[in-house]
Regions:
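Alpha-helical scaffold/interaction cores of sigma-54-like transcription cofactors
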Residues: 2-703
Length: 703
């Protein structure tokens, strides 16, 4: 295999799929193209937002490409004026860590204070936060090129000089040429302006898709966003030639060597200037505000745990002390003391204000410390739950406690968090909605102006459900394949729909996630406002976790409000002196309840009400809480295949066999079936001789 030739050119103006309904190039494909061409670096400059920064950074690092982190922002004279919708463009690239921090601040100000139809910045903001940032004059929509187009040469020169005064040698006049008339008009005037003012020029290609043949798909995508059709020439915006693809150095030199050859060389100069590292393995935990009498967070956590140990276990407290001490030492060693104090405070606040909170879910139920602190109400040893599944000293990751909470009280709890840590320290988390198969076909059909009947007919081939892809259905459905082969409109519809399938359609706010930062949120994460005016991160859940932010999941669960209302309704009928109903103290061995469940009378019962689950309960005939836990755990894709064996073994215990005797104590409660990930960990520990920490690594590799 021949060695890839190294190119001396870098693309510094590149739109990914995070330029919503405009960027067609997926990050992984753009990065791979840079690698294939031998280009040493690549920039991300999405429209208005920094959504894809972390994914882009990771993809570049994995491919051996230097990531250049940036954004294409909109400019206005004064971000506080909300009258004129007209904006210019600039490209901002981070040179170093300080530059990246300033980029986050500029972006956040633009998306919060400066937002008027789109995020906007101005010279005043740029003056304050310019350190460590390179500025390019952007595309034909840049404010300097626009002034030249309008014949306002003096104003163009004056504005370019202002940018130069702010950024110095890090301000560049950006040159682009895609055959547009407006670009022809300003190309040489921009070169002249740069020479006159002593500003360097740089060549870019304003990438919106990877390959030349992707042009029509990208144009269709753009029309989807504009709610127009490809027949509407106004929607096309930038002419017919497919020039906005990922070009090689040779292709770029062919355009610019006769204009300003240094514009190509300067891409490497800029790339050499940009050296940002997004550090991993660091956690940005806020300090929990301690009572005046407490000297340290460790002292306070231990005091609360000691109180909880005696409250939870009473006379058996000492028998559980060893495990609690092990957990505490692990928490202290891993540096997560403040995390536990913060979560404890949140749940305590909710309970003290009569806001229903769930008993605990997920791996946090395996922590005795969480149980003693009141974070969970599930005693871990009774159910064989393992602390290492939650917090593994051999795999340092942030703890993750999911908190089920009353939807009616959720905002009150969030307000408490804001008051405790400061409004500028808190943000909800963004989430992205992608174009699913059926939706892609519908939207592409509209953009292509195809007959509605045809689009609806093709759409009916696509079933609803997760993991459904157009290509997957096309490979299995003969009728659909026949139409694809014989009908050109169907083929065009499905080809373009497949091309845009999975791209981000719009953003919304995550139902549960809240970030708490040790300093102002904009020291770590770019922010914006959601449609309700709440501050949200521009990074989605995975990116927030990747950069080490503390995330708390407050999941509004309506069932908690229903249970709370039911408890109150029952108690309102109680006579004076009668024992009040307390749902937290219900007996788990009530035969009449299991008889009702076994008959499938579970309509309205959380997680047990679907027709399929009712059928499982009728066949399983649960007799204990462990049976219910197993039923819920098994009733999902994959593990569902084990349900018949589980039921068979439950009703015929004499037929249960174990591959080796050591499996019996681990699998006895689940009738010889492996149901839980904790069982996997125990098997690896007992049969493989691993520690529980190492066993957890095996579990993660399997899951």
């Amino acid at each position: 295999m021949s060695e890839i030739k190294k190119e001396n050119f870098v693309h510094l103006h590149c739109h990914t799929e995070y330029s919503l309904l405009d960027g067609h190039g997926r990050i992984k494909n753009l990065v791979q193209k840079a690698k294939d061409l031998g280009q040493p670096a690549l920039a991300i400059t999405d429209h208005g937002y920094m959504y894809g920064i972390v994914q882009f950074y990771d993809a570049c690092k994995a491919a051996g490409i230097k990531p250049i982190l940036g954004v294409e922002l909109y400019t206005t004279q004064d971000i506080h004026e909300k009258k004129d919708r007209k904006t210019g463009h600039i490209i901002l690239l981070a040179k170093n860590e300080q530059g990246y921090k300033n980029l986050v601040k500029i972006e956040s100000i633009a998306a919060v204070e400066g937002f008027y139809y789109r995020p906007r910045t101005d010279l005043k903001v740029l003056k304050e936060y310019h350190e460590g940032i390179i500025c390019l004059s952007a595309c034909i929509q840049g404010d300097v090129p626009q002034l030249l187009l309008e014949g306002k040469q003096e104003e163009a020169y004056a504005l370019a000089k202002e940018y130069k005064d702010i950024f110095g040698e890090d301000y560049y006049i950006e040159l682009q040429y895609h055959g547009l008339e407006d670009q022809k008009k300003v190309l040489f005037p921009l070169v002249t302006l740069a020479k006159t003012l002593g500003i360097q020029v740089v060549a870019t290609n304003d990438i919106h898709y990877v390959e030349k043949q992707d042009a029509f798909a990208q144009r269709t995508l753009m029309c989807m966003g504009m709610k127009r059709t490809v027949d509407d020439t106004e929607a096309l915006g930038y002419g017919n030639p497919p020039h906005w693809y990922f070009k090689s150095e040779a292709e770029m030199r062919k355009i610019f060597d006769g204009v300003a050859p240094e514009a190509i060389t300067n891409t490497m100069v800029i790339a050499d200037k940009c050296n940002v590292e997004l550090k991993r393995g660091e956690y940005h935990l806020p300090k929990f505000p301690l009572p005046a009498t407490i000297k340290s967070n460790v002292q306070y956590l231990r005091m609360l745990c000691e109180e909880g140990l005696h409250r939870r276990y009473r006379k058996d407290a000492e028998t559980h002390r060893e495990r609690m001490e092990y957990e505490l030492q692990t928490i202290e060693k891993m540096g997560f003391v403040d995390y536990f104090l913060i979560v404890t405070d949140i749940i305590s606040y909710a309970k003290n204000h009569n806001i229903p909170v769930g008993p605990g879910r997920g791996s946090s139920a395996g922590s005795m410390v969480a149980y003693c602190l009141g974070i969970t109400d599930i005693e871990p040893t009774r159910f064989g739950l393992l602390f290492e599944r939650f917090l593994n000293p051999e795999r340092v990751t942030m703890p993750d406690v999911d908190i089920d909470i009353s939807p009616e009280g959720r905002e009150l709890v969030i307000q408490h968090i804001i008051e405790k840590y400061g409004e500028d320290h808190i943000a909800r988390i963004i989430t992205y909605s992608s174009l699913a198969a059926k939706g892609a076909i519908r939207d592409v059909g509209k953009a292509l102006n195809l007959e509605e009947a045809l689009v609806m007919r093709v759409g009916k081939y696509i079933p609803t459900g997760p993991d459904v892809t157009i290509a997957g259905i096309l490979s299995k459905n003969k009728a659909m394949k026949k139409e694809y082969d014989e009908n050109a409109d169907v083929r065009k519809l499905l080809d373009i729909s497949t091309s845009v399938e999975g791209l981000i359609r719009h953003t919304s706010t995550h139902a549960a996630g809240v970030i708490i930062a040790p300093d102002a949120m904009t020291e770590f994460v770019p922010i914006q406002k959601d449609k309700n005016g709440a501050i949200i991160s521009q990074f989605e859940m995975g990116s927030v976790e990747a950069i080490g932010m503390l995330k708390v999941d407050l999941l509004g669960l309506k069932t908690l409000d229903v249970l709370n209302a039911a408890e109150k309704a029952v108690n309102s009928k109680k006579q004076k002196g009668e024992v009040k109903l307390d749902l937290t103290r219900l007996k788990m061995a009530d035969r009449s309840v299991y008889a009702m469940l076994s008959s499938g009378q579970t309509t309205g019962v959380f997680q047990l009400e679907s027709a399929g689950m009712r059928d499982v309960l009728r066949k399983m005939k649960p007799t204990c809480i462990e049976d219910l836990i197993a039923a819920i755990s098994l009733y999902r894709p994959g593990p569902m295949d084990s349900i018949p064996k589980f039921i068979q073994n439950k009703h015929n215990p004499d037929t249960i066999t174990y591959a080796v005797p050591a499996l019996e104590p681990i699998l006895k409660d689940t009738y010889g079936c492996i149901v839980y990930q904790e069982q996997v960990m125990q098997i690896v520990r007992d049969l493989g001789g691993y520690t529980l920490g190492r066993s957890d690594l095996v579990r993660r590799a399997m899951s």
